[in-house]
């Protein structure tokens, strides 16, 4: 864990760049996707969907005085529960969508569908989809995250808020609208042709690399640490630590560290 990560919940969090998403902005996102039967009921769901834990009321922040308006005050709740809900809905909708589109019509097998699903819901794809919707503009993050941890370009946070946005839509409306949102985003912004040509299952790639390079049959070893609701993952070759990664879940942290390992071995650039 690097020094930046160790201090991100200790530095002064107040960030004048934060702006909560408005009703008009939520409605415009849905209009952009041509979801005409959307009716916004409670803007608080959507505001919460963009609140990173670094901007919540934490014990380590008690020494810092709120600077007043127009700076947003620290928040009570982060997006993490909505992210959990959105992640489950996303997986269900994508599975059904791929079944209807690629099995019923083209008779593609389970292996093909699984591979495609993994690529749609991987962190890299969700980060890109967040950017397509300009969700980074509505992030509520600490000044430390803004200045030192890639801020509004942080791929892990953008991945999280895409899932949290799905959770917010579901809680505010219903499953049908959340499903429409996911499908419209996929059909508008997801390049299936490019995806089928690119292998971004980094954990699988590093496993194949180990099999090819190391004659002793050794496999990558993953060790996990959870701190402040972030999953950190270390990748070892035998007893040697190669690289560290992180993510919003155990699976995401494994993909992150696997990608970094491929860069470490000059497989990726």
Provide a role label for each language-model segment.
Residues 1-269:
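Double-stranded RNA-binding/processing signature
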């Amino acid at each position: 864990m690097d020094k930046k990560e160790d201090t991100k919940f200790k530095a002064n969090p107040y960030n004048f760049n934060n702006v909560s998403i408005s009703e008009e902005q939520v409605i415009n996102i849905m209009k952009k996707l041509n979801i005409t039967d959307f009716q916004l009921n409670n803007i608080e769901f959507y505001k919460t969907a963009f609140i990173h834990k670094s901007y919540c009321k934490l014990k380590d922040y008690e020494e810092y005085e709120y600077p007043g308006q127009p700076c947003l005050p620290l928040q009570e709740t982060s997006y993490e529960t909505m992210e959990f809900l959105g992640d489950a809905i996303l997986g269900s909708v994508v599975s059904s969508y791929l079944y209807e589109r690629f099995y019923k019509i083209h008779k593609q097998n389970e292996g093909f569908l699984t591979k495609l699903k993994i690529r749609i819901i991987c962190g890299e794809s969700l980060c890109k989809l967040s950017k397509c919707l300009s969700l980074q503009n509505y992030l509520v993050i600490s000044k430390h995250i803004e200045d030192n941890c890639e801020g509004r370009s942080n791929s892990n946070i953008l991945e999280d808020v895409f899932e949290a946005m799905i959770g917010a839509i579901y809680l505010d409306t219903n499953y049908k609208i959340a499903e429409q949102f996911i499908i419209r985003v996929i059909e508008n912004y997801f390049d299936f042709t490019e995806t089928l040509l690119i292998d971004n299952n980094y954990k699988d790639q590093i496993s194949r690399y180990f099999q090819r390079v190391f004659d002793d049959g050794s496999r990558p070893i993953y060790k996990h640490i959870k701190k402040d609701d972030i999953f950190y993952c270390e990748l070892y070759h035998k007893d040697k630590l190669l690289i560290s990664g992180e993510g919003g879940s155990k699976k995401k942290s494994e993909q992150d560290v696997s990608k970094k390992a491929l860069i470490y071995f000059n497989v990726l650039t």
